[in-house]
Amino acid sequence: MNKLRKLKRDTDHRQALMRNLATSLFKHGRIMTTEAKAKDLRRVAEKLITIAKKGDLASYRRVLGYLYEEDVAYDLFQKIAPRYQGRNGGYTRIIKVGPRKGDGAMMVYIELV
């Protein structure tokens, strides 16, 4: 059974965090976050790209219900998903940056390949 990280947040806060991170990732192409958040975000982002690759209206509405910005969902379908048509998974890359100065948490870049 897959164990999900709780990230010291309740369910609603954790889901909102993932929606925010996914929206930012698709908007900017690359974001810096902690390693634990990036590993959870990778699962979410890869599933959203796989859904977007279908390209039908039901898929668009499903993605639109998850992401916070409509223009980001549009870009996901028109620009991002077509790049990965011949690729089965592995749409993101995690690059370690080093520990954060304040608390030593491992910081990483997560980016679209």
UniProtKB/Swiss-Prot annotation:
GO molecular function ontology, one term from the record: structural constituent of ribosome
GO biological process, one term: translation
Keywords attached to this entry: Ribonucleoprotein, Ribosomal protein
Pfam hit, one: Ribosomal_L17
PROSITE patterns, sorted: RIBOSOMAL_L17
One GO CC annotation: cytosolic large ribosomal subunit
Top-level taxon of the source organism: Bacteria
Family (UniProt): Belongs to the bacterial ribosomal protein bL17 family.
Matching NCBIfam families: L17 (TIGR00059)
Record's subunit section: Part of the 50S ribosomal subunit. Contacts protein L32.
Protein name (database record): Large ribosomal subunit protein bL17
Organism of origin: Caldicellulosiruptor saccharolyticus (strain ATCC 43494 / DSM 8903 / Tp8T 6331)
Gene name tied to this protein: rplQ
